[in-house]
Structure formats: structure tokens, C-alpha cells
Regions:
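A short acidic, Gly/Pro-enriched loop at the edge of an enzyme's catalytic core
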Residues: 85-95
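Conserved SAM/SAH-binding beta-strand->alpha-helix loop
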Residues: 53
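A short glycine-rich, Lys/Arg-flanked "PGG" loop and its adjoining helix->strand segment in the class I
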Residues: 111-124
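Conserved alpha-helix/loop element of class I SAM-dependent methyltransferases that forms part
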Residues: 3-22
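Conserved SAM-binding loop of SAM-dependent methyltransferases across substrates and taxa
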Residues: 31-43
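Conserved SAM-binding loop
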Residues: 60-61
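Conserved SAM-binding strand-loop segment of SAM-dependent methyltransferases
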Residues: 69-82
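Conserved beta-strand signature within the Rossmann-like core of class I S-adenosyl-L-methionine
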Residues: 125-132
Length: 146
């Protein structure tokens, strides 16, 4: 069963700098609600969703069969701090993370590793957005290095 997007998540998607042809990495995608909303808004958009929980990834895949078959979406089970960009994947224009513990400031070493990995998955002009702003805030990745 498809989940309806919440008002909060809708506001977050609205705040993203979306454009035709953009490639997006969603960290902590859960059941894929935001990813589906994004790919159904614009043509040529691609979202790779990752989540540490297999249950969320299974639900996302089950609810997104058409979008996956059309090459608009993919989902991978992975912790962001251990994520390796698959060889077939190109770099991303933006990444966003909502309620992701590795990026909430409570675990500095995990957060440092996660930011290094995200930085490697983004194009040089890539941008990272996390919750905590109005509704998002951008994280500067310029000085992030491994």
C-alpha cells in the first residue's frame, strides 16, 4: 500500500532545489515516500535512496515497482557511514537526510565519516541538505576530506 506523504515531508521536498535531470541521494529514505514524490514531480529525475533498515528498503521497493522499472528510483540497504557508491552509479547533484542519527551531532566520529562518504558521492558542485532548518539547512562540504 502506498503511503501518503506527510505535510512535513512535503515541505521538505518543496524546499529542495529540484530541476529536470537532477540526480539525488536520499539518506534515510525509509519506505521511499519522499523519493517517489520527487521522481513523480519532474521528468528525468533520478533518486537513489539508502536506509540502514532492511524493512524500510523492502517497503520502498514494494511501493515503487513502476518507478524502479522506469529507471527513476533505486534503493539500497546501507548505513551512510559505511555506504559505497555502486560502480554503475554516477555522482549526485544533491543529497538530503531527514532524521538520520549519523548526522545529528551526537556521534562526531560517525558524522565525520558519513560526511566524507556523502562528499565522495556528490559532484564537485554537489550540495547536502539536512533537517533542522526551515525546513532544511545546507551543510558545507568544502573542507570535508577523508
Amino acid at each position: 500500500m502506498l503511503q501518503k506523504i506527510s505535510q512535513r515531508l512535503l515541505e521538505i521536498v518543496d524546499a529542495l532545489p529540484l530541476r529536470k535531470g537532477i540526480r539525488i541521494l536520499e539518506i534515510g529514505c525509509g519506505s521511499g515516500v519522499a523519493a517517489r514524490e520527487i521522481v513523480n514531480r519532474l521528468q528525468g529525475v533520478y533518486v537513489l535512496g539508502i536506509d540502514r533498515l532492511l524493512k524500510g528498503i523492502e517497503q520502498a521497493k514494494k511501493s515503487s515497482k513502476t518507478e524502479i522499472a522506469n529507471g527513476k528510483l533505486n534503493f539500497i540497504q546501507a548505513k551512510v557511514e559505511e555506504f559505497n557508491l555502486p560502480e554503475k552509479e554516477q555522482l549526485f547533484d544533491i543529497a538530503f537526510a531527514i532524521r538520520v542519527g549519523a548526522l545529528d551531532g551526537r556521534h562526531p566520529e560517525i558524522e565525520k565519516r558519513a560526511l566524507e562518504i556523502i562528499s565522495k558521492a556528490l559532484k564537485k558542485t554537489g550540495r547536502l541538505f539536512i533537517d533542522g532548518g526551515d525546513p532544511l539547512k545546507e551543510i558545507n562540504l568544502i573542507n570535508i576530506s577523508s
